[in-house]
Amino acid sequence: MLCLPVFIILLLLASPAAPNPLQTRIQSNLIRAGPEDANIKTDKRVISGLLASILVPLIDAIIG
């Protein structure tokens, strides 16, 4: 009789402790990947587009 509650408690404690294999594989791949693999390099077009969207309205407001 006492075996069943102990088994259920152990089962509940063990199930969240088991790692998700997909998640651990993705994490290990991200750790091993360098910035060039993840394509983190800044693109000049992105920066120029951001500057243009900020500076053009600012200059228009100053001029008139």
Curated annotation (Swiss-Prot):
Main location: secreted
Modification sites for Isoleucine amide: 63
Domain of life from the UniProt record: Eukaryota
GO cellular component, one term: extracellular region
GO molecular-function terms, A-Z: toxin activity
Cleaved propeptide residues: 20-43
Sorted UniProt keywords: Amidation, Cleavage on pair of basic residues, Neurotoxin, Secreted, Signal, Toxin
Tissue: Expressed by the venom duct.
TM regions (residue ranges): none
Signal peptide: 1-19
The keyword Signal is annotated on this UniProt entry: yes
Keyword hit for ATP-binding: no
Localization in the cell: Secreted
Note in the entry: The mature peptide does not contain cysteine residues.
Family membership: Belongs to the conotoxin T superfamily.
Name of the protein in its database record: Conotoxin VnMLCL-033
Organism: Conus ventricosus
